A protein has these predicted regions:
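Structural recognition of the beta-strand scaffold that forms the well-ordered cores
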Residues: 53-58, 81-86, 110-116, 120, ...
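Oxyanion-hole/transition-state-stabilizing segment in secreted/luminal serine hydrolases
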Residues: 63-78, 92-144, 153, 164, ...
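Catalytic His-Asp segment of secreted/periplasmic serine-dependent ester chemistry enzymes
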Residues: 169-247
Length: 247
């Protein structure tokens, strides 16, 4: 019965008019992210130890709490018994694979912070022929369904945890960036997943942006990944909500 929900979700997705029969939604098809096995297994060890009360789950932006965001992490999040389950380059389908292969098994966190999906929107720096390939190019709706599947898996594994779904961060120089627009469209959908009881939604995008929608390189030098200043902004924007969920 492990994949029953996933199978039903996939069938419903493929039957939807949003998706043609020849365009499967890769965002909900669990697949190993090659080269990440060692880090994945380290998460399984943490899960079995069962000590973490707060888990951050996501892609490179989450992963980099151990890099550009480390000073902020050590000051604010480490004292809360937090664990970092971020893997650079991960998409929703990679997180689903991880959840199917031991992540969170035996772990009973009080809260989970989830942000995933910008790599489903598009990988920075990939050749155009790959970006145009359906495996790499998801619609906002497809990405949102992938996030919904992750939520279902997390709730099954950690029924008592409160999950904070973060809006996908803004990217690109300004509001005309197509990847940013798609992230915003995804956020508009996943906002509806919050029930105010076990699942919550928080979008901190405006904290990174200028009044005209410009994304400053002083916060995200590559217009995608925050620097240390950006991690402080992120931390400050969600700290109160996360601590509320940990009570």
């Amino acid at each position: 019965m492990k994949h029953t929900f996933r199978s039903l979700l996939l069938a419903a997705t493929l039957a939807s008019p949003l998706f043609a029969a020849d365009a499967p939604n890769y965002a909900i098809q669990p697949v190993l992210h090659p080269g990440t096995e060692k880090r994945h297994e380290s998460f399984n060890v943490i899960s079995k130890q069962g000590a973490a009360e707060l888990v951050f789950l996501g892609d490179s932006i989450t992963h980099a709490w151990e890099g550009r965001g480390k000073a902020v992490w050590d000051k604010t999040w480490a004292p809360l018994k937090a664990a970092n389950f971020g893997i650079s380059g991960d998409r929703t389908e990679h997180v689903l694979w991880r959840l199917d292969h031991g992540n969170f098994d035996g772990l009973k966190p009080k809260a989970i912070v989830l942000m995933i999906g910008t790599n489903n929107t598009g990988h920075q720096g990939r050749p155009q022929k790959e970006i145009d390939n359906a495996v790499y190019k998801c619609t906002a709706e497809q990405t949102a369904v992938g996030i919904k599947a992750i939520l279902a898996s997390l709730q099954k594994k950690c029924p008592d945890a409160k999950i904070l779904v973060l809006g996908i961060f803004p990217r690109g120089a300004d509001k005309n960036d197509k990847f940013r627009q798609q992230n915003e469209a995804t956020n508009a959908i996943i906002k509806g997943y919050a029930d105010g009881k076990k699942v919550f939604f928080l979008d901190v995008s405006d904290k990174f942006l200028e009044a005209d929608g410009t994304l400053p390189k002083s916060i995200m030098p590559d217009l995608l990944h925050p620097n240390e200043k950006g991690y402080q902004i992120w931390s400050d924007a969600m700290e109160a909500k996360v601590k509320e969920l940990l009570k």
